[in-house]
Structures are given as structure tokens and as C-alpha cells.
Amino acid sequence: MGKSLEWADLDYELQPWIKKAINVSGFDSMTPVQASTIPMFAKNKDVVVESVTGSGKTIAFVIPILEKIISEGINNSKFKKGHFYSLILAPTRELSMQIQNVVSSFLEHYPEDQYPIRSQLVVGTNEKSVRDDVNTLLDERPQILIGTPGRVLDFLQSPSVKTSSCGMVVLDEADRLLDVSFFKDVEKILNVLPKQRRTGLFSATISSAGTLIFKTGLRNPVKITVNSQGKNAPTTLNLFYSVMKPEEKLQNLIHIMNNIRFKKCIVYFSTCVSVTFFYQYLKYLQQTDKTLREDLQVISIHGKLTTQSRRKALSTFTESLSDCILLTTDVAARGIDIPDVDLVLQIDPPTDADIFLHRCGRTGRANKIGRAIVFLNEGREEDYIPFMEVKNVDIEETDINKNKISNDNNDEFYQRFTKWLLSDRANYDLSVKSYVAFIRYYSKHSATSIFRLQSLDYVSLGKMYGLFRLPRMPEITKYLQDKEKSGETVVGYYGEGWLMNPPPIDMDKYAYQDKKREKARIEELKNLAQINDKKKLKAELKKKNMAWSSKTMTKEERQERRKKLDLKRKAIELEIAAEAERDESDTEITQDWKDEILQKKKKKKVGSEMQGSFDDL
């Protein structure tokens, strides 16, 4: 018989104000992971929790922390200044802020007549320094700290911050916190905390952390795994894939945005610069070209934005009442809980298979229906589907690209794209940066048997970014050379990097709309022209005097060789002379040595003759 999911059936009584917070939030019953985790974590057990995305893991550790603060009597004025009771670590600022919001939503119902329970956010921002965070700890005396590893480590290194009262630690998205980019900081943080503490690790893919989980100071942990019928994705989440050429991806994205109904959609790109580039182009299509519906709100967020910008963008997306689309990177892939996200699109699969689940998990949360679609390039990338099946993730093909885009429509779309690029050289520069960044990203894919640079269609990929001329890159040079050797024709490539014939513009006359940038470009062009003339003159002089130069070099080489031979000859003569002197002084020893060898030879000869005579007997 399964564990009861009724809040009333917990084996201990929840605080009345926590019950009220649960009721106000609309959590009528517990999720399976909450029913399994809350009793364990609240009763002095270390836990390692693996559960599908959107299953309520945050509540599963927030309630035990609040309960323990009450039961341990931490909510009183005697709690020491500069101390804290619990620490929650998360890999991103966005997830940290979300956890802070969940804690705050519970504390809104905390009795005003009792000593307050407070939480503090400790994340890197341009607005606050580490010193400011320390002052907040000293002034407000929060019992709960929530933050990212880098900032928390700097924070804990302050002599004013005392760690001896820390009784509970949570690693949310633990597999990410234990990978190479965070592990050193996390390890240092855990080393300065008391060993006698409760530790909880939470993630949808904790198994990928392997043996590293044992380096977190766990003591007799309880492993809690909650899957949906043996699958690694919730049953309310429908996973789809669509196979197409790279150049068709953007056109399909716009088709979905214009024709498929959704409230909120998250679109994942590979790199920060790609988010910026496609955001600018989509805004152009919406405001100028009028081919993207005007009632759709388009927002972007990525890791290179300031904390304030990221926070504002995420808040706008979360609170928007109109149809809304968020262009982002994996910065918004883990743990972020945004209501009403009913569609997730991945323009390319992530480098890590675990990230695929985290991306998809932004929809289909809290038993709501969600759809997630990943775009795959034609060819080798189609093997990604059986690859994910091995990881218990079933993905069905969707008919979004069933009616293949006609060449005429594709050409028309591409020409409209290049028209935007041609309007300002800055657009082209951003396109090139996005293209190059994607190739670098692709080269670092963990599933190298599927995602190989040798199999990438560089020309079609260039058209996806609107490029009319490919940049010079070793990868592209090798790609073209391999095609030439095999006798294959590269469709859509017209030599010297051009993807359009005739070339749509003279690159020397390709201008920036920004006057300062254009002036700097013209100056640089003049300087390069002078340098190029000098190089050309030097090349011609070298060509004219090539035979003479060769002869001169040969003559010099001969002279140098003679000098070396003379020196070598003299060195040999000196060595011979020295040997002769040694021979004269050691004549007797040498003679004795020769005599000894002769005697040995004679003995061998006699022995051989004697052996022969014995054989004759």
C-alpha cells in the first residue's frame, strides 16, 4: 500500500501557521516526494532525493527547515549575532531567488507575536557587496541563508560570520553543484560547517553525481527516489522531437509562435550571444516586418546580463498576463518554477543529457499538462532519440515539420533574413559571433558519437543565422576540403565563403548604422590598405629576387657547413692526440690485457679439442 498523500496523515503535527500557508497556496495534498521526504528530513535523517522535475522538491525541504527552527528553539532573541541555522545552496541566482520567494510565502503566515524567523539571499549582484551581506546578517539575524556557492563562500570567509550554529544544509540541484564548475567551492563551504548537521541533496538527476555525493558529509543517508512509472519525466509532460535542416529551425519557431496556442513558452538556445541575436531579429519581425504576431510579448535572459536585468526579465515573464515567450540559455533550465509555462522549445539539444530533462521540466509542473519539443538536424542527430530511450526518456515525433518547408518559402525567408543583416553591419557581426559560438558549443557535446563537427552542415547552419558569407574557420576549411576530396558538391556554397551568388554586397562598403563605429571602420580600412600595399610590394620583391636569394642562401649554407666541419675535424684530432697520450702511459696495462685475452682463447681451444677426444671414446 502506498504512502498517504494527505497532510493530516504526516506522523507529526505541522505548525498551525505552516498549515495555513499550505492551504492558502492551494496545496490540497502532498506530492509523493513530499510525503516521503518531509518526515525523514524533519526527524534528523540525511536525505538524497531524486524526483522528476515539477514534483515539489522545494516544499519538501523548506517545511522541515522551518519545523526544525521551531523545535530547536532557534526563533528567539538568544540566537547569537553573526550565526545562522540553515544554509540552502543553489547553482543560479534565479533559483536562489525562487527558493527565497517560497520561504517568504510561508513566513507571511508566521505569528507576529513571536520572535521572527527571517531568511537572507546571498548572491552576487552589482548592487550589493559581500560586506553589505555580512552587515545584513549582523543587523537582521536571519536563521536561513539562501545563495550561490561563489558568493556564499566569500560570505563565510568573513570573520564576522560564524558557522558553528549551522544545523541544516540543503544542496538544491545537487548534481549541478557537485560537477566540476562548482564542486571546489561547495567542498570548501561544507568543510567550514559543523559535521554534526543534517544534509539534504535534491535533484531530478542526482544519480549523475555518482560517488561525489559521499563527499558532502552525509551520515547514514536515506535515498528517496520518486519516478513516474519508471520514467525520468512526469506523466503530465509530453516530449516530442522534430527533424529538419538547420536553416528551417527559425522558420519553424516562428510558425509555432504564430499558429500554436500557449500561455507561456520558453525557447532554449545554445549560447548567450545567440539569445541576443535572435531576440533582436524577432523584435524586428514583430515591429517592422510585421510577420510575427504583435500581441506576443518577447523577453530574453542569459548569464551575461546583470543580476538586475535578469531579475527584471524573469519577473516580467512570470507576471505577464498576455501570451509570452522567453528566449534563454540553460541559466533558466534548472529549478525555476514559473506558473503557466505550457510549452518548451529546444532549438538544439543540450550538451548534457541531464540538462534535457531539466529544460523540459519547466513545463508539465504540479500535475499540469505541458509540451516540450526539441529540434534535431537531419542525419546523425536522429540517433539522439534511441540515446535518450536508454535513459528512460521516451520522445515521440511531432508533425510540426511534417509538411516540409518548400524551397521557395525557404529562399524567401532567407532573403528577408539577409535583408535585415544587410541593413546594418552590426547585425552581421552579431550573426557571425553567434555562428562561431555555436560551433564551439557543438564541439564540446558530451555525446560525441552523435554530435560530431564532421557531420555538421555548415552551409545550412550559416543560413539559420542569416549569413550570406561564412567566416574563416579551421572547421569550415576542413569541411570544404573533405567535400572536395570526396567529389561532393556543397549545395548553396559559391566559393570564398559566399552563400549567395552574386554576392549581395561589397564587404568594403558594408556600413554600420552607428556613425562612430562606421568612422572607425573606414579608418581601419585605410590603415589596412596601406599595410596590404607594403605586403604586396614585399611579396613582389621576394618573387623577383627568388633565384638570387636561393643561391645566396645556398652559398652561405655551404660556408657555414665548412666551418662546422673544420671545427669537428680539429676536435677529432685533439681527441686522437689525447688518446695517444693515454695509450703511452698505459702501455703495460694494455699489453697485460691483450695477453690475458690470448690466454683465454688458448684455453677455449684446448677445451674444445679435449671435448672432441671424449666424444671419440
Curated annotation (Swiss-Prot):
InterPro entries: CTT_SPB4, DEAD/DEAH_box_helicase_dom, Helicase_ATP-bd, Helicase_C-like, P-loop_NTPase, RNA-helicase_DEAD-box_CS, RNA_helicase_DEAD_Q_motif, SPB4-like_CTE
Residue span, Helicase C-terminal domain: 252-406
Protein keywords: ATP-binding, Coiled coil, Helicase, Hydrolase, Nucleotide-binding, Nucleus, Ribosome biogenesis, RNA-binding, rRNA processing
Pfam families in the cross-refs: CTE_SPB4 (PF13959), CTT_SPB4 (PF23681), DEAD (PF00270), Helicase_C (PF00271)
Annotated GO MF terms: ATP binding; ATP hydrolysis activity; RNA binding; RNA helicase activity
Top-level taxon in the UniProt lineage: Eukaryota
Enzyme Commission code: 3.6.4.13
Subcellular location field: Nucleus, Nucleolus
GO biological process: assembly of large subunit precursor of preribosome; maturation of LSU-rRNA
Keyword Glycoprotein: no
GO cellular component, one term: nucleolus
Residues covered by the Helicase ATP-binding domain: 38-224
Name of the top EC class for this enzyme: hydrolase
Key word NADP present: no
Binding site for ATP: 51-58
Reactions that this protein is recorded to catalyse: ATP + H2O = ADP + phosphate + H(+)
Motif (Q motif): 7-35
Motif (DEAD box) on chain: 172-175
Family of the protein in this entry: Belongs to the DEAD box helicase family. DDX55/SPB4 subfamily.
Subunit structure: Component of pre-60S ribosomal complexes.
Function: ATP-binding RNA helicase involved in the biogenesis of 60S ribosomal subunits. Binds 90S pre-ribosomal particles and dissociates from pre-60S ribosomal particles after processing of 27SB pre-rRNA. Required for the normal formation of 18S rRNA through the processing of pre-rRNAs at sites A0, A1 and A2, and the normal formation of 25S and 5.8S rRNAs through the processing of pre-rRNAs at sites C1 and C2.
Domains (record comment): The Q motif is unique to and characteristic of the DEAD box family of RNA helicases and controls ATP binding and hydrolysis.
Identification of the protein by name: ATP-dependent rRNA helicase SPB4
UniProt organism field: Candida glabrata (strain ATCC 2001 / BCRC 20586 / JCM 3761 / NBRC 0622 / NRRL Y-65 / CBS 138)
